[in-house]
Protein backbone atom coordinates (compact mmCIF):
# COMPACT_ATOMS: atom_id res chain seq x y z
CA UNK A 1 0.00 0.00 0.00
CA UNK A 2 1.31 3.42 -0.95
CA UNK A 3 2.06 5.65 2.03
CA UNK A 4 0.46 9.14 2.04
CA UNK A 5 2.85 12.05 1.58
CA UNK A 6 1.40 13.83 4.63
CA UNK A 7 0.52 12.54 8.08
CA UNK A 8 -1.54 15.53 9.25
CA UNK A 9 -3.26 18.10 7.04
CA UNK A 10 -5.42 21.17 7.45
CA UNK A 11 -8.12 21.51 4.82
CA UNK A 12 -9.42 25.04 4.22
CA UNK A 13 -12.95 24.92 2.81
CA UNK A 14 -14.62 28.10 1.66
CA UNK A 15 -18.28 28.57 2.40
CA UNK A 16 -18.83 29.09 -1.32
CA UNK A 17 -17.56 25.56 -1.97
CA UNK A 18 -20.56 24.21 -0.06
CA UNK A 19 -23.00 26.02 -2.36
CA UNK A 20 -22.11 24.09 -5.49
CA UNK A 21 -24.04 25.75 -8.29
CA UNK A 22 -26.61 27.21 -5.91
CA UNK A 23 -26.69 30.93 -5.20
CA UNK A 24 -26.90 30.60 -1.43
CA UNK A 25 -26.70 28.11 1.41
CA UNK A 26 -25.54 24.50 1.48
CA UNK A 27 -25.96 22.03 -1.37
CA UNK A 28 -26.53 18.60 0.15
CA UNK A 29 -25.02 16.66 -2.76
CA UNK A 30 -21.88 18.82 -2.65
CA UNK A 31 -21.34 18.52 1.09
CA UNK A 32 -21.85 14.75 0.96
CA UNK A 33 -19.30 14.42 -1.85
CA UNK A 34 -16.77 16.56 0.05
CA UNK A 35 -17.29 14.41 3.14
CA UNK A 36 -16.74 11.25 1.06
CA UNK A 37 -13.40 12.66 -0.14
CA UNK A 38 -12.39 13.53 3.43
CA UNK A 39 -13.41 10.03 4.58
CA UNK A 40 -11.19 8.47 1.92
CA UNK A 41 -8.04 10.25 3.10
CA UNK A 42 -8.95 9.72 6.75
CA UNK A 43 -9.14 5.98 6.06
CA UNK A 44 -5.59 6.17 4.68
CA UNK A 45 -4.47 7.13 8.18
CA UNK A 46 -4.18 10.85 7.50
CA UNK A 47 -5.15 13.13 10.39
CA UNK A 48 -7.55 15.79 9.09
CA UNK A 49 -8.36 19.21 10.51
CA UNK A 50 -10.77 21.53 8.69
CA UNK A 51 -11.21 25.30 8.76
CA UNK A 52 -14.46 26.37 7.16
CA UNK A 53 -15.59 29.73 5.83
CA UNK A 54 -19.05 31.27 5.88
CA UNK A 55 -19.38 33.15 2.60
CA UNK A 56 -22.28 30.99 1.42
CA UNK A 57 -24.35 32.45 4.27
CA UNK A 58 -22.83 35.83 5.12
CA UNK A 59 -19.84 37.85 3.98
CA UNK A 60 -18.60 40.39 6.53
CA UNK A 61 -16.46 42.41 4.15
CA UNK A 62 -19.29 42.85 1.64
CA UNK A 63 -21.72 43.93 4.34
CA UNK A 64 -19.27 46.43 5.81
CA UNK A 65 -18.87 47.93 2.34
CA UNK A 66 -22.64 48.42 2.31
CA UNK A 67 -22.59 50.46 5.52
CA UNK A 68 -22.57 47.91 8.34
CA UNK A 69 -19.92 48.26 11.03
CA UNK A 70 -17.03 46.02 9.92
CA UNK A 71 -16.47 44.36 13.30
CA UNK A 72 -20.18 43.56 13.65
CA UNK A 73 -20.27 42.18 10.12
CA UNK A 74 -17.22 40.01 10.80
CA UNK A 75 -18.77 38.56 13.94
CA UNK A 76 -21.88 37.69 11.92
CA UNK A 77 -19.60 36.00 9.40
CA UNK A 78 -18.02 33.97 12.20
CA UNK A 79 -21.46 32.75 13.25
CA UNK A 80 -22.08 31.68 9.65
CA UNK A 81 -18.96 29.49 9.84
CA UNK A 82 -20.39 27.79 12.93
CA UNK A 83 -23.54 26.95 10.97
CA UNK A 84 -21.42 25.46 8.18
CA UNK A 85 -19.31 23.52 10.68
CA UNK A 86 -22.42 21.96 12.21
CA UNK A 87 -23.72 21.01 8.75
CA UNK A 88 -20.36 19.45 7.91
CA UNK A 89 -20.26 17.56 11.21
CA UNK A 90 -23.78 16.23 10.62
CA UNK A 91 -22.85 15.04 7.13
CA UNK A 92 -19.77 13.34 8.59
CA UNK A 93 -21.87 11.63 11.25
CA UNK A 94 -24.20 10.26 8.60
CA UNK A 95 -21.15 8.99 6.69
CA UNK A 96 -19.85 7.17 9.77
CA UNK A 97 -17.04 9.61 10.57
CA UNK A 98 -16.29 10.83 14.08
CA UNK A 99 -15.69 14.58 14.22
CA UNK A 100 -15.54 17.41 16.71
CA UNK A 101 -16.33 21.09 16.17
CA UNK A 102 -14.26 23.64 18.06
CA UNK A 103 -15.21 27.29 17.87
CA UNK A 104 -13.09 30.38 18.50
CA UNK A 105 -16.30 32.01 19.79
CA UNK A 106 -17.88 30.28 22.77
CA UNK A 107 -21.28 28.74 22.07
CA UNK A 108 -21.06 26.02 24.68
CA UNK A 109 -24.50 24.49 24.16
CA UNK A 110 -23.66 23.77 20.52
CA UNK A 111 -19.90 23.38 20.02
CA UNK A 112 -16.74 23.03 22.05
CA UNK A 113 -14.52 26.04 22.66
CA UNK A 114 -11.18 25.95 20.89
CA UNK A 115 -8.61 24.22 23.09
CA UNK A 116 -5.37 23.38 21.32
CA UNK A 117 -4.42 20.36 23.42
CA UNK A 118 -7.83 18.73 23.00
CA UNK A 119 -7.81 19.36 19.27
CA UNK A 120 -4.41 17.69 18.89
CA UNK A 121 -5.57 14.73 20.97
CA UNK A 122 -8.67 14.34 18.79
CA UNK A 123 -6.49 14.28 15.68
CA UNK A 124 -4.19 11.68 17.20
CA UNK A 125 -7.27 9.55 17.96
CA UNK A 126 -8.28 9.67 14.29
CA UNK A 127 -11.16 12.09 14.77
CA UNK A 128 -11.70 14.93 12.31
CA UNK A 129 -11.55 18.37 13.91
CA UNK A 130 -13.58 21.19 12.38
CA UNK A 131 -12.52 24.68 13.41
CA UNK A 132 -15.26 27.33 13.30
CA UNK A 133 -15.51 31.10 13.90
CA UNK A 134 -12.19 31.91 12.26
CA UNK A 135 -9.66 33.32 14.71
CA UNK A 136 -12.45 34.70 16.91
CA UNK A 137 -11.37 38.24 16.03
CA UNK A 138 -12.81 40.67 13.48
CA UNK A 139 -10.65 41.91 10.60
CA UNK A 140 -9.03 38.48 10.16
CA UNK A 141 -10.13 36.14 7.38
CA UNK A 142 -10.76 32.43 7.59
CA UNK A 143 -7.67 32.02 5.37
CA UNK A 144 -5.65 33.57 8.18
CA UNK A 145 -7.44 31.25 10.62
CA UNK A 146 -6.37 28.30 8.46
CA UNK A 147 -2.73 29.40 8.57
CA UNK A 148 -2.93 29.96 12.33
CA UNK A 149 -4.65 26.65 13.15
CA UNK A 150 -2.31 24.85 10.77
CA UNK A 151 0.68 26.09 12.72
CA UNK A 152 -0.95 25.35 16.08
CA UNK A 153 -1.83 21.80 15.01
CA UNK A 154 1.66 21.20 13.61
CA UNK A 155 0.24 20.08 10.28
CA UNK A 156 2.47 19.07 7.39
CA UNK A 157 0.61 21.20 4.86
CA UNK A 158 -2.40 23.52 4.45
CA UNK A 159 -4.70 22.49 1.60
CA UNK A 160 -6.89 25.25 0.21
CA UNK A 161 -9.87 23.72 -1.57
CA UNK A 162 -11.34 26.07 -4.16
CA UNK A 163 -13.42 26.07 -7.33
CA UNK A 164 -10.25 26.44 -9.45
CA UNK A 165 -7.61 23.74 -9.90
CA UNK A 166 -4.67 25.85 -8.74
CA UNK A 167 -3.14 29.31 -8.99
CA UNK A 168 -3.04 31.01 -12.39
CA UNK A 169 -1.06 33.89 -13.83
CA UNK A 170 -4.36 35.75 -14.34
CA UNK A 171 -8.02 34.90 -13.78
CA UNK A 172 -8.71 31.89 -16.06
CA UNK A 173 -12.40 32.81 -16.20
CA UNK A 174 -11.46 36.10 -17.85
CA UNK A 175 -8.31 35.12 -19.72
CA UNK A 176 -8.43 31.71 -21.45
CA UNK A 177 -4.66 31.96 -22.02
CA UNK A 178 -3.91 32.12 -18.29
CA UNK A 179 -1.33 29.56 -17.22
CA UNK A 180 -1.42 27.49 -14.06
CA UNK A 181 1.56 27.47 -11.75
CA UNK A 182 2.72 24.04 -10.60
CA UNK A 183 5.00 25.57 -7.98
CA UNK A 184 5.14 29.07 -6.60
CA UNK A 185 6.98 30.89 -3.84
CA UNK A 186 5.15 32.77 -1.10
CA UNK A 187 7.14 35.89 -1.98
CA UNK A 188 5.95 35.74 -5.60
CA UNK A 189 2.34 35.14 -4.57
CA UNK A 190 2.47 38.16 -2.25
CA UNK A 191 4.38 40.46 -4.61
CA UNK A 192 2.14 39.69 -7.60
CA UNK A 193 -1.07 39.72 -5.53
CA UNK A 194 -2.13 36.39 -7.02
CA UNK A 195 -5.15 36.04 -4.69
CA UNK A 196 -3.99 32.67 -3.36
CA UNK A 197 -4.86 33.77 0.18
CA UNK A 198 -4.78 37.15 1.84
CA UNK A 199 -1.34 38.60 2.56
CA UNK A 200 -1.56 37.95 6.31
CA UNK A 201 -2.18 34.23 5.79
CA UNK A 202 0.57 33.95 3.18
CA UNK A 203 3.06 35.77 5.39
CA UNK A 204 2.28 33.50 8.34
CA UNK A 205 2.81 30.39 6.22
CA UNK A 206 5.99 31.79 4.71
CA UNK A 207 7.52 32.78 8.03
CA UNK A 208 6.77 29.37 9.56
CA UNK A 209 7.77 27.51 6.38
CA UNK A 210 4.34 25.86 6.23
CA UNK A 211 3.63 24.75 2.64
CA UNK A 212 0.29 25.43 0.99
CA UNK A 213 -1.43 23.52 -1.81
CA UNK A 214 -4.27 25.09 -3.80
CA UNK A 215 -6.53 22.65 -5.66
CA UNK A 216 -10.10 22.16 -6.86
CA UNK A 217 -12.45 20.40 -4.46
CA UNK A 218 -14.80 19.82 -7.40
CA UNK A 219 -12.29 17.60 -9.21
CA UNK A 220 -12.99 13.95 -8.41
CA UNK A 221 -10.46 12.43 -5.98
CA UNK A 222 -8.25 15.53 -6.15
CA UNK A 223 -7.92 15.57 -2.37
CA UNK A 224 -6.66 11.98 -2.35
CA UNK A 225 -4.14 12.74 -5.10
CA UNK A 226 -2.85 15.76 -3.17
CA UNK A 227 -2.49 13.73 0.02
CA UNK A 228 -0.65 10.97 -1.85
CA UNK A 229 1.83 13.52 -3.21
CA UNK A 230 0.67 13.24 -6.81
CA UNK A 231 0.74 16.16 -9.23
CA UNK A 232 -2.39 18.21 -8.52
CA UNK A 233 -3.06 21.93 -8.14
CA UNK A 234 -0.39 24.47 -7.20
CA UNK A 235 2.18 24.09 -4.44
CA UNK A 236 3.16 27.33 -2.68
CA UNK A 237 6.30 27.12 -0.56
CA UNK A 238 9.25 29.15 0.68
From Swiss-Prot:
**Activity regulation description:** Inhibited by UTP.
Question: Where do the coiled-coil regions begin and end?
Answer: none
What is the top-level taxon of the source organism?
Answer: Bacteria
Per the record, what are the reactions this protein catalyses?
UMP + ATP = UDP + ADP
Pathway in which this enzyme or protein is active: Pyrimidine metabolism; CTP biosynthesis via de novo pathway; UDP from UMP (UMPK route): step 1/1
UniProt keywords (A-Z) are:
ATP-binding, Cytoplasm, Kinase, Nucleotide-binding, Pyrimidine biosynthesis, Transferase
Name the record gives this protein:
Uridylate kinase
* Source organism of this protein record: Nitrosospira multiformis (strain ATCC 25196 / NCIMB 11849 / C 71)
Q: Which gene encodes it?
A: pyrH
